[in-house]
Amino acid sequence: MARRNEERGDRRNREEERDSEIVEKLVHINRVAATVKGGRRFSFAALMVVGDQKGRVGFGHGKAREVPEAIRKATEEAKKSMIRVPLRESRTLHHDGAGRWGAGKVMVRAAPPGTGVIAGGPMRAVLETLGVQDVVGKSVGSSNPYNMVRATFEALKAQSSPRQVAAKRGKKVSDVIGRRADGASAAQPAADAEG
């Protein structure tokens, strides 16, 4: 029995450690009203994005009569819905991608070192909490924060690392990224043959 309690304590400590590393960003807060027979009843809706800045990110939506409670609910939901996104060199995305949710469309592009996070509003919050340091993002269509966040997540879910692509195709990573054993790229022999 004592051992089980120790294990439970360890699990709680690990969860607390993991939570202490998580960065939380409030993307949007909205006052909503329900019309009831006595007039209007106001409540607040919060949209939060959380991430560990090491490739994990999640978003959540919370509603409550008070702002802090709405934020707490949104944060809890965001922590439960976290996804892992493979990052190249722990600083950028592996490839360009696009996502769509409703009328909101977003495009994300991998960028060279020193570019920074070039993205606006809700998209920027998602990419910063993910831990991306160099990326270019563009939003087209709806600027509704909920649609933008969801569209960004759709684009991020489509990201795959060379290792994942190689496993899916049943090949070696070096075959997928086009490198040969001698270090020349696969495109080199074709260029040599033409010239």
From Swiss-Prot:
Q: Which InterPro entries would you find in this protein's record?
A: Ribosomal_Su5_D2-typ_SF, Ribosomal_uS5, Ribosomal_uS5_bac-type, Ribosomal_uS5_C, Ribosomal_uS5_N, Ribosomal_uS5_N_CS, Ribsml_uS5_D2-typ_fold_subgr
Q: Where is the region Disordered?
A: 164-195
Q: Where is the composition biased (Low complexity)?
A: 183-195
GO biological process terms, semicolon-separated: translation
Biased amino acid composition, Basic and acidic residues? 172-182
Ordered alphabetically, the record's keywords are:
Ribonucleoprotein, Ribosomal protein, RNA-binding, rRNA-binding
Give GO cellular component annotations, separated by semicolons. Answer: small ribosomal subunit
* Pfam families linked: Ribosomal_S5, Ribosomal_S5_C
Domain called S5 DRBM: residue spans:
22-85
Q: What HAMAP family does the record point to?
A: Ribosomal_uS5_B
Q: What is known of its domains?
A: The N-terminal domain interacts with the head of the 30S subunit; the C-terminal domain interacts with the body and contacts protein S4. The interaction surface between S4 and S5 is involved in control of translational fidelity.
Q: Which purpose does this protein serve, as stated in its record?
A: With S4 and S12 plays an important role in translational accuracy. Located at the back of the 30S subunit body where it stabilizes the conformation of the head with respect to the body.
Known partners and oligomeric status: Part of the 30S ribosomal subunit. Contacts proteins S4 and S8.
Which NCBIfam families does the UniProt entry name for this protein? rpsE_bact
Q: Which family does it belong to?
A: Belongs to the universal ribosomal protein uS5 family.
Name used for this protein in its record: Small ribosomal subunit protein uS5
Native source organism of the sequence: Phenylobacterium zucineum (strain HLK1)
Gene symbol of the encoding locus: rpsE
